[in-house]
Amino acid sequence: MDLYVSSYAPSLSALIRARERARTQKNAPGYANVISFAAVGQAQPGGGQELRELPEVEREIHRIRDETNMPPDMTFEIVTGDAATIEGAIQAFREHRWVHLACHGAQDADKPFESWFAMRDGPLTLMRIIQERYTRSEFAFLSACHTAVGDASTPDEVLHLAAGMQFAGFNGVIGTLWRVDDAIAHEVVTRFYREMFKRPVIDFEYAAEALNVAVVESAKEVPLEKRIVFVHIGI
């Protein structure tokens, strides 16, 4: 980690599309370096989902707002509780360039488009996400379990949640390889955004490097196997 920065791509074509999309976005009239950012968190999923409460979700999101030196001109919307529904999340995806998602998530290896994030009124499936068009989206941080896990038997054929978000229109995505420890997630997430926001020009294309910095900075407090749960995909 001290010698190189890791980033992955579901396929070469996905990487090419993301680069072309990012170039088009940045060259579009009216594009400005003022980031519109939404944090979507669901601590108490409903809709018949039998999932444990996630009491640390609100704390994670408020640490992003309060402890990362967020630029004062950044638009930051918090979508939690009753507002963090399927349609509430989709609206945040449509309206903001960056999205942070803190909730339960699960991969369905047999039916990858049925993989989901748990919202207040039920599961937000990958199929539902890709039905929309996201012209503004640039970057998504998926602070949920198993969002970048494929299938060991067919690693090149399974569309996991992080790859699906890139396919839907997010040029860069951070996902997780296994269950996320809440306390560790808080530290890595806070350090990641602090690193992103300290640059004179805030750009989502710095995400892979910022994640590497956050993971390395956590080395003294966090064991390696828990630090490397987060991976960057795309650009």
Question: Which functions belong to the PLM regions below?
Answer:
Residues 1-235:
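Catalytic cores of enzymes
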